[in-house]
């Protein structure tokens, strides 16, 4: 079998290499960077592609699960593709798949077609964010990558949080199909900019034949990874809803997830550098601890951004659009500090300080939100969002900067895909756990306090309609129960935010810029 040119470095050797002077590293890699004007257009295109993908994270049920399944599963495949094929071709392929999936959704005659469209769109999404970051790492010097990462992170955050607001406006003004029709419109400039302006050096590899490249994709291992992620997504989708968490189906799915994932890891270890994910990259200290940090902080962010609007809708009886407007403090804080961290990281020379700040402020912000009562004024909600938003802004891009700083150029796509995978899985698993806490607490407490209302009624009632289950004189009681159920989900996010300190402590302190002479 043909071998890649990437040397078989151990995780420790990778760490040692990252301390090599920046001038020497960039000379060794012989990178040819894009001109300023051309890069400006390319960067706008990258922002548009990231924006449309973040907008698509708002789906629920099978539609969202099909998307998340393929998004997670294909992260590693795209990481390997970017490391051995021209980045431009792979990135355009990911964009094309995402748009094909969106068009299928927009024209879907039934639910099956919609699920199929979301599945295809998820495959494309698996390569868009990691592709944008890979293009960045090859378009500007390493010392400047953090700045543009910060801007991309800000765009990603704006799109994710503003998704409900935009979707609500589209649905109120026209058909829901325009939620999907809008994606090809947003993507068109990116596609043409990439085709005509993007020119990058091909990855350094000895694999010249298509047979060798297909072998490097490690399809048997990918099948194992695909199966393990499918078991996990199904268990999270069905658990506590279709079946109880103690049901044999759910238990078997979790066991299968663990067994198949273990088999995948053993195959990766045996295949060395020919693996889909070489263990020397996965076990590299900053990558491993960075994945843990990203898992925890992403989980915290997903819970916050999902249940804070629910609190506003249920407790304060706000519409979807009004509740989205009340999220402006967290949007502003996250956007400003994501960008600011990107600017300051090269100035300070390290990314770890911002990770420390992120852990502290996320924990404080979620702690403050957990003190809310159903009688709390809106101004408390607005104020408590700020430290959490600052923490999210500081956390979003730092582990990606670490991967782009520490790894050799040809390994960056795989390292970035691992970090993005950890972020996606962290949000998926945390939201599922929070949903179990919320629905379980709310249904049991309401059924206990109001015996005439059974559990199934609570679970099938919309968030804003819960207040209609009881007479007006009992409204304060049910609002108190709803508040306590939502606050319990924030206890989980406090735990995740606090646990992220483990990831911080494990990170290497490596410079992102050359030391001043």
From Swiss-Prot:
The keyword Cell wall biogenesis/degradation does not apply. Induction: Expression is positively regulated by the secondary metabolism cross-pathway regulator scpR. GO terms for cellular component: plasma membrane. Residues 1-24 are annotated as: Disordered. Glycans are attached at residue 172. The keyword Cell membrane applies. GO terms for biological process: transmembrane transport. It comes from the Eukaryota. Keywords: Cell membrane, Glycoprotein, Membrane, Transmembrane, Transmembrane helix, Transport. Disruption phenotype: Does not affect production of fellutamides. The chain crosses the membrane at residues 37-57, 59-79, 89-109, 112-132, 151-171, 178-198, 219-239, 247-267, 292-312, 328-348, 352-372, 381-401, 412-432, 485-505. It is found in: Cell membrane. It is a multi-pass membrane protein. InterPro entries: MFS, MFS_dom, MFS_trans_sf. One of its GO terms (molecular function) is transmembrane transporter activity. SUPFAM superfamilies: MFS general substrate transporter. Its main location: membrane. PANTHER family: MAJOR FACILITATOR SUPERFAMILY, MFS EFFLUX TRANSPORTER INPD-RELATED. MFS efflux transporter; part of the inp gene cluster that mediates the biosynthesis of fellutamide B, a mycotoxin that acts as a proteasome inhibitor. In the first step of fellutabmide B biosynthesis inpC activates 3-hydroxydodecanoic acid to generate 3-hydroxydodecanoyl-AMP that is then loaded onto the T0 domain of inpB. The 3-hydroxydodecanoyl-S-phosphopantetheinyl-T0 is sequentially extended with L-Asn and L-Gln by the two CAT modules of inpB. The linear lipodipeptide from inpB is then transferred onto inpA for the addition of the third amino acid, L-Leu. Belongs to the major facilitator superfamily. This is MFS efflux transporter inpD. The lineage of its organism: Eukaryota, Fungi, Dikarya, Ascomycota, Pezizomycotina. The gene is inpD.
């Amino acid at each position: 079998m043909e071998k890649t040119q990437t040397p078989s470095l151990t995780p420790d050797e990778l760490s040692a290499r990252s301390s090599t002077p920046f001038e020497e590293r960039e000379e060794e890699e012989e990178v040819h960077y894009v001109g300023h004007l051309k890069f400006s257009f390319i960067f706008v295109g990258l922002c548009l592609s990231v924006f449309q993908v973040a907008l698509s994270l708002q789906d629920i049920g099978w539609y969202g699960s099909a998307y998340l399944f393929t998004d997670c599963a294909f992260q590693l495949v795209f990481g390997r593709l970017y490391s051995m094929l021209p980045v431009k071709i792979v990135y355009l392929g990911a964009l094309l798949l995402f748009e094909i999936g969106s068009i299928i959704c927009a024209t879907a005659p039934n639910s099956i077609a919609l699920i199929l469209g979301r599945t295809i769109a998820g495959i494309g999404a698996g390569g868009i964010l990691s592709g944008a970051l890979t293009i960045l790492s090859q378009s500007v010097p390493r010392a400047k990558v953090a700045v543009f990462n910060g801007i991309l992170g800000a765009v990603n955050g704006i799109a994710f949080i503003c998704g409900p607001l935009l979707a609500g406006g589209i649905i109120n003004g026209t058909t829901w199909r325009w939620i999907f029709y809008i994606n090809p419109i947003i993507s068109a400039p990116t596609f043409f900019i990439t085709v005509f302006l993007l020119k990058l050096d091909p990855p350094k590899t000895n694999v010249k034949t298509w047979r060798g490249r297909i072998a490097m994709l490690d399809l048997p291992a990918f099948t194992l990874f695909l199966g393990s992620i499918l078991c996990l997504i199904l268990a999270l989708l069905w658990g506590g809803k279709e079946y109880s968490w103690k049901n044999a189906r759910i238990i078997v799915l979790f066991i299968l997830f663990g067994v198949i994932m273990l088999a995948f890891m053993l195959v990766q270890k045996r295949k060395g550098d020919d693996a889909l994910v070489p263990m020397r990259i996965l076990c590299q200290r900053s990558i491993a601890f960075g994945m843990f940090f990203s898992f925890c902080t992403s989980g915290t962010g997903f819970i916050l951004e999902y249940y804070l609007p629910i609190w506003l809708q249920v407790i304060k009886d706000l519409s979807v659009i009004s509740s989205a407007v009340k999220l402006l403090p967290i949007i502003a804080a996250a956007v400003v500090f994501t960008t600011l961290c990107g600017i300051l990281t090269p100035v300070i020379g390290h990314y770890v300080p911002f990770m420390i700040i992120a852990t502290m402020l996320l924990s404080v912000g979620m702690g403050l939100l957990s003190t809310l009562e159903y009688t709390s004024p809106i101004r408390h909600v607005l104020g408590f969002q700020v430290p959490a938003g600052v923490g999210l802004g500081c956390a979003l891009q730092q582990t990606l900067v670490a991967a782009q700083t520490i790894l050799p150029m040809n390994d960056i796509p795989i390292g970035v895909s691992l970090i993005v995978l950890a972020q996606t899985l962290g949000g998926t698993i945390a939201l599922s756990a929070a949903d179990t806490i919320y629905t379980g607490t709310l249904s049991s407490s309401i059924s206990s306090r109001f015996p005439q209302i059974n559990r199934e009624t609570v679970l099938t009632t919309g968030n804003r309609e819960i207040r209609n289950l009881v007479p007006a004189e009992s409204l304060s009681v049910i609002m108190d129960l709803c508040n306590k159920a939502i606050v319990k989900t924030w206890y989980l996010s406090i735990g995740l935010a606090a646990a992220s300190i483990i990831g911080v402590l494990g990170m290497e302190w490596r410079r992102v810029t050359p030391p001043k002479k």
